[in-house]
């Protein structure tokens, strides 16, 4: 009889358990639906006015990126563009972000942009980052190019103006990479590597040349302008998809960028002020670095482009040269 009486109790307990299970299932389903709805809302909600005019720009912490910094500094709340700067620690990392659309534009080695275009990646240049501004530094005991034979010499990247300048310097002296070991090295590491004798010299963007001079661990070895007159190095390069989808914004940013370059050229004091705000170096290092760089003429002309790809071809950095119109998007110019 005890078993018979327990049946209703067991059934009641099972019923309560089933209710709890269903409540739990319903709760989970509602949470999932709520999460999906929230995600959909966040993805599709209207962008704010600032978001609609935001351009994400990648950069490395070098003097060559000064026009990008100045563009942000000169930005006004009611202006057509909002700049969102994204700092990277190396050129490969930065180029990956540009190529994949993680950023909209970048201040980047122009050779990397041309090489990406050769590889079928849709990137488009609008302007230069500066003129001149490169430096070749060697140990204090190096007195001729021949003294570099058998030693290591650093550059920031194989696809760079620094690589071109170094190859031209060696070529004039009758040397090649068989005689001097060329190593790629992050610019911030170069001054200390020179100081401890890891390398005998390097070619780099400022202020990392001036930093070695400030430390008393190196000296200027060669004037890059004597190797390649009017040499170009960095450029403002856009992700092609961003340009297609936001052409007016890309054009507005290009104008703001060129205006910033003109402002820097006309206000030398602003060059130092903005540089010190973004780059934590001594005043003397920044002052020295700014003496060898210009921002007044940022036009990536066809003549400049032809000189660039001539040198790139000459030292085997590129095989299939993109045409000027393929790489430089003149529709972005004011």
Predicted regions and their residues:
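Pocket-lining segment of extracytoplasmic ligand-binding domains
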Residues: 110-112, 183, 188-275
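Short, Lys/Arg-enriched N-terminal segments with co-localized hydrophobic residues
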Residues: 1-17
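Secondary-structure end/capping motifs
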Residues: 244-319
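Short, solvent-exposed loop/beta-turn-alpha elements that line the ligand-binding surface or hinge
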Residues: 75-81, 226-228, 295-302
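Short, glycine-/small- and polar/acidic-enriched structural segments
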Residues: 42-175, 181-184, 200-206, 219-221, ...
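Ligand-binding clefts/hinges and TM-proximal coupling segments of bilobed small-molecule sensing domains
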Residues: 34-40, 82, 160-181, 255-285, ...
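Conserved C-terminal helix/tail region of periplasmic/extracytoplasmic solute-binding proteins
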Residues: 313-334
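N-terminal Sec-pathway targeting helices
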Residues: 17-30
